[in-house]
Swiss-Prot record:
GO cellular component, one term: intermediate filament
Tissues and organs where the protein is expressed, per its UniProt entry: Strong expression in narrowly defined pattern restricted to the lower and middle cortical regions of the hair shaft in both developing and cycling hair. During hair follicle regression (catagen), expression levels decrease until expression is no longer detectable in follicles at resting stage (telogen).
The protein's assembly and partners: Interacts with hair keratins.
Name of the protein in its database record: Keratin-associated protein 19-2
InterPro entries: KRTAP_type_19 (IPR051528)
Gene name, Swiss-Prot/TrEMBL: Krtap19-2
Keyword Glycosyltransferase on entry: no
Length: 141
């Protein structure tokens, strides 16, 4: 967390922004301080929240604890355009809890659905590559 402003650029504002957003707890790519990435704002975004807003937006999306980006997405932990809770890489058009890349569910990785899926897979707490297509518990990368 640590309310720390990383780059404070773009059109973001607030505390703990990564590239120009505001929020707390960024995790992916630019791990500096906390918050959204690219112009977005929220809580625990991954790479960027390009115009996004909410809790942990990614790249233009908004949500809670997104992984890489939530390009136009919204919700809890959106990825790349999706919305959900705790997404891994991207939720391009996805929705739900932790959608990945167009997927939906809780903590999905890349287009998966369910509870913490990785890459189109399903399980619990999967984050990204390590859960490619499968399922597991608390796997990060």
């Amino acid at each position: 967390m640590s309310y720390y402003s990383g780059y404070s650029g773009g059109l973001g504002y607030g505390y703990g922004s990564s590239f120009g957003g505001l929020g707390c707890g960024c995790n992916s790519i630019r791990r500096l301080g906390c918050g959204s990435g690219y112009g977005g704002f929220g809580y625990g975004s991954g790479y960027g929240g390009f115009g996004g807003f909410g809790y942990g937006s990614g790249y233009g999306g908004y949500g809670y604890g997104s992984g890489y980006g939530g390009f136009g997405g919204f919700g809890y932990g959106s990825g790349y355009g999706g919305f959900g809770y705790g997404s891994g890489y991207g939720g391009f058009g996805g929705f739900g809890y932790g959608s990945g890349y167009g997927g939906y569910g809780y903590g999905s990785g890349f287009g998966g659905y369910g509870y913490g899926s990785g890459f189109r897979g399903y399980g619990c707490g999967c984050r990204r590559s390590s859960c490619c297509g499968g399922y597991g518990f608390s796997s990060f990368y």
